[in-house]
């Protein structure tokens, strides 16, 4: 019994010296750093997802405009809505000057989360057929993109989540519009979402 205890103690000492604590800690530290560093495969997947969304949003705009070129190319402004749609600014770190990958990813992810209530509104307006399917698919694809980007954000606590109460109030405000205003609002949302995705694609290519 004494021989077994001594042998066991010797084995534990060998294991402890073979794997120093500093080595294990260094490996954990390296893993935490590389976990947020995008691989070539993950970056390619992100770009493909964004490009796909841009294409689908453009198709939705065409359907909404009934393929009228003037309508498609115009960026309508419905001033009475006072919509606070997400936009990119220089301070977000996504532009050529002052590019900051971490700040940019936080802004992109937060912006996509802000757009969700507007995409839900559009989905509800498209009642049936291909329009409804495409609207649902655009929203689900944008949610998938958010999850991809969350994995690359260095500090997820910096991501800003919209207030559920504010979203409920916004939906009520949008629903109170007349039919013409609703169509113009949908066009405004889609054109701004497309612009946001274009900025996102350019920023992700730099990462």
UniProtKB/Swiss-Prot annotation:
Source species: Marmota monax (Woodchuck)
UniProt-annotated location(s): Secreted
Cystine pairings recorded for this chain: 65-71, 94-104
Residues that bear Phosphoserine: 74
Primary subcellular site in the record, as a coarse category: secreted
Compositional bias annotation for Polar residues: 31-44
GO molecular function, one term: interleukin-6 receptor binding
Presence of keyword Transcription: no
One matching Pfam family: IL6
InterPro entries listed in its UniProt record: 4_helix_cytokine-like_core, IL-6-like, IL-6/GCSF/MGF, IL6/GCSF/MGF_CS
Protein name: Interleukin-6
Region (Disordered): 26-47
Gene Ontology process terms (BP): acute-phase response; glucose homeostasis; hepatocyte proliferation; interleukin-6-mediated signaling pathway; liver regeneration; positive regulation of multicellular organismal process; positive regulation of receptor signaling pathway via JAK-STAT; positive regulation of receptor signaling pathway via STAT
């Amino acid at each position: 019994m004494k021989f077994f205890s001594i042998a066991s103690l010797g084995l534990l000492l060998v294991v402890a010296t073979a794997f120093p604590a500093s080595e294990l800690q260094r490996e954990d530290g390296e893993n935490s750093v590389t976990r947020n560093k995008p691989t070539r495969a993950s970056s390619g997947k992100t770009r493909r997802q964004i490009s796909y969304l841009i294409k689908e949003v453009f198709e939705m705009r065409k359907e909404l405009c009934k393929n009228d070129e003037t309508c498609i190319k115009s960026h309508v402004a419905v001033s009475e809505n006072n919509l606070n749609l997400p936009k990119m600014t220089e301070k977000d770190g996504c532009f050529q000057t002052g590019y900051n990958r971490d700040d940019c990813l936080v802004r992109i992810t937060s912006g996509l989360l802000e757009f969700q209530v507007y995409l839900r509104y559009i989905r509800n307006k498209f009642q049936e057929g291909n329009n409804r399917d495409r609207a649902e698919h655009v929203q689900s694809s944008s949610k998938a993109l958010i999850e991809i980007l969350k994995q690359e954000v260095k500090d997820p606590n910096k991501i800003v989540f919209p207030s559920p109460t504010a979203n409920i109030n916004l939906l009520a405000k949008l629903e109170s519009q007349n039919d013409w205003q609703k169509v113009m609002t949908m066009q405004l949302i889609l054109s701004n979402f497309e612009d946001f995705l274009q900025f996102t694609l350019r920023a992700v290519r730099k990462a």
